[in-house]
Amino acid sequence: MTSSDLLPGLCPTGSLRVVINLGNPVLAQGTPEAPTGVTVDSARELAERLGVELELTTVTAARHAYAALVEGHVDVGFLAIEPAREEGVRFTTPYVGIEGVFATGDTDLTVADVDREGIEIAVRSGSAYDLYLTRTIEHATILRGDEAEDVYEGGADVLAGVRQPVTVYAQQNGLTVLEPAFQAIRQAIAVPRDRPESQVAALTAVVEELKGSSFVAASLERAGQVATIPGS
């Protein structure tokens, strides 16, 4: 894939503007001033292929990354594929797969028991698992906040989140992570919805190349993170 296949319309300012969500520790680490991780590595690789400067904007939650894309403040972002987001962005094929899990202090609760009357589930507002549970939960109540852990500590029955940070929190607080995972979260590159499908196709080709060349696997390993790589 050459830069001429990607550049038209992708970088209207002459630089590649990318939003990085530091709220997902599997995909991004570090600080706003010095972010690291597979999303940052991928953004740098894309800018290098295009031969343009990279401008990174960091946020603390997926909903803020989504807003930056929809409002046209950035050209590229890294988000989980969810139907609710497709009205505002277009997605490539997924480059990484992670999982959404429940944790609870109720040792009698199972994954199948979570969706019942009287159960309150704590989520981070606007996250992939919030969107997924919003369209699938029929009986339980979803409680939203900036941090799911804070909502859980406010009295919710179940904490929902990405497996890795939820597991750490569960270990620190004597909770049980319920198996199996309730969601397979497919992470992809996203662009604003008004970008042409040809642009998405070109980015998808890059994603597939980065997966096939072990670029993504090597980046995850450097960051000390474990995730599945779809199609590999």
What is each of the regions a protein language model found here?
Residues 15-22, 26-28, 36, 112-129, ...:
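Short loop->beta-strand "edge-of-pocket" segments that line small-molecule binding or catalytic clefts
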Residues 22, 96-104, 167-210, 226-232:
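Periplasmic-binding protein-like
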Residues 52-53, 70-79, 118-120, 138, ...:
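Alpha-to-beta junction loops
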Residues 55-67, 107-109, 128, 141-153, ...:
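Short helix-initiation/N-cap motifs at beta->coil->alpha
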Residues 92-95, 104-121, 198-201:
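Flexible hinge/capping segments at coil-to-helix
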